Amino acid sequence: MSDWSIEDARSGYNVTHWSQGFYGIREDGEVTVSPNPQNPDHKVGLNELAKSMVEAGVSLPVLVRFPQILHHRVESLCEAFNDAIKKYDYQNDYLLVYPIKVNQQKTVVEEILASQKSKEVPQLGLEAGSKPELMAVLAMAQKASSVIVCNGYKDKEYIRLALIGEKLGHKVYIVLEKMSELKMVLIEAEKLGITPRLGLRVRLAFQGKGKWQASGGEKSKFGLSAAQVLKVIAELKSANMLDSLQLLHFHLGSQIANIRDIRQGVSEAGRFYCELRQLGASIDCFDVGGGLAVDYDGTRSQSNNSMNYGLNEYANNIVNVLTDLCNEYEQPMPRIISESGRHLTAHHAVLITDVIGTEAYQPENIQEPSEDAPQLLHNMWQSWLEISGRYDQRAIIEIYHDSQSDISEAHSLFAVGQLSLADRAWAEQANLRVCHEVKGLLSNNNRYHRPVIDELNEKLADKFFVNFSLFQSLPDAWGIDQVFPVLPLSGLDKAPERRAVMLDITCDSDGIVDQYVDGQGIETTLPVPAWSADSPYLIGFFMVGAYQEILGDMHNLFGDTNSAVVRIDERGLSQIESVLEGDTVADVLRYVNLDAVDFMRTYEELVNQHIVEEERASILEELQLGLKGYTYLEDF
């Protein structure tokens, strides 16, 4: 296609919309990163960046973090709420709380906290949902506002640690998830001589729509019913501790795509707040939880992978609803808290790796079957003649369907011994030739052709074998059908010659990416430049900064990848600040209680038994290097 342009590539991969300006495609067809949208000219090619890392000794795959994106996401969300507060004359402020479960990596949490260094009044706190997370935030929250929100189920130790946080100078809100926690908090607070800051997680009747909708609604795993909330109020009153109740919390679920769901949830929770205030509770914080979505596919829709609103609309709806409710009930406006971890972290990380090989269909010439060949093969030859233009007596779709029926029959006949292996091979090649010809004759403009086009794109797609583990690096793609943008990092200045699917290197048929952003929709294959064994072919998996690292598993003992922190300096040049080596083979063996030291002893015994003396040292050295090596492919 001579009329192909970079704009075609940008729209074809929908980069403009899912990237939020952080990623783009340069005129030379290279994918770029621009971590500070305020300096849009500061763009660095990811292909060049990856090559420089490889030259510096960093093996692929590598997870590349751009901390400036984290800073920008914090600032943009706070700015959206600050603007909404001014717009509606809201009489309180906003606090962004980062739930570290989204990404607990030290560099990520520290960079999010570092976004507050220049702030006179920090607008950032931290959230913990377990004892290990609580221990982490107790040591880090002082770098921002020192506000800590404690969610999740709690035992006595968790509660005591949270209360000790108050002694350390933090403001620790212990959010009650179930009735039994209240008694434990009051007992341990008295023992420690601390007045607790309590929060209530209310269980809303309203349930938003999405993959995580079970987080809300009456059957939610977490939260207190209306009756339980009133019981907590009564118990606090009888203990003369009602003033300790300072926060109301609810959570509709992660990735809420429809702004109306958010508005409705805030409205219901807001009435809880106002009525509890009327009952004498001193609640002054309104925690909307998570739910702020990320537009993974860039369609700006209500799909599970998208969102039909922007940051300003999100903030405006929350502030507007609360303003109206507080005015209606004549109650003070509470501090607004949101726990928007996915929004902060998703864009900041990209997994870059290499294609190690492909399996591609190439049309081969077929010869007319012999006169004594099975009639089925003659039927298939006739279909081939018709579709190849030598005859034109039937509709394209009819010929295609007949060919599919014929190949199915061929497989059945082979299975019962009525078709030879050579005949089966001929039938398969004839079917592929028909499919190839049919695809070239179909039109996207004909709606009757579109289902067949989709079917053929999948059937004829190249298989790209990619040096990564889906289960380790993109577990949500496997577990919940999450869509992540995937792009070749170069060659996009030319029209894509092929369509492909990405397969990982695990020994598992589920190790395949089966959904791709393609224009304004999702497809089962990805348009790509053709692969060549003569030059490196790099692939980027984008928006993997939220949840993927901590959820990733070690299927086939593929471990953590290498990771790097990269900044773009004031000159627009990339600076690799740090590299964290991924797991070695010995590391992952240790994880499953296999000892590399014991293995070396065993290897030595076997070498002494079976290898001639002059080869023993080199064999042992290779075995030792194998234990010290990267779990991913390095030589291919």
UniProtKB/Swiss-Prot annotation:
The gene is speA. Belongs to the Orn/Lys/Arg decarboxylase class-II family. SpeA subfamily. InterPro entries: Ala_racemase/Decarboxylase_C, Arg_decarb_HB, Arg_decarbox_C, Arg_decrbxlase, De-COase2_N, Orn/DAP/Arg_de-COase, PLP-binding_barrel. It catalyses: L-arginine + H(+) = agmatine + CO2. This is Biosynthetic arginine decarboxylase. The modification N6-(pyridoxal phosphate)lysine is found at K101. PANTHER family: ARGININE DECARBOXYLASE, BIOSYNTHETIC ARGININE DECARBOXYLASE. Pathway: Amine and polyamine biosynthesis; agmatine biosynthesis; agmatine from L-arginine: step 1/1. Its cofactor is Mg(2+); pyridoxal 5'-phosphate. Keywords: Decarboxylase, Lyase, Magnesium, Metal-binding, Polyamine biosynthesis, Pyridoxal phosphate, Spermidine biosynthesis. One of its GO terms (biological process) is putrescine biosynthetic process from arginine. GO terms for molecular function: arginine decarboxylase activity; metal ion binding. Its EC number is 4.1.1.19. Catalyzes the biosynthesis of agmatine from arginine. Substrate binds at F286, D287, V288, G289, G290, G291, L292, A293, V294, D295, Y296.
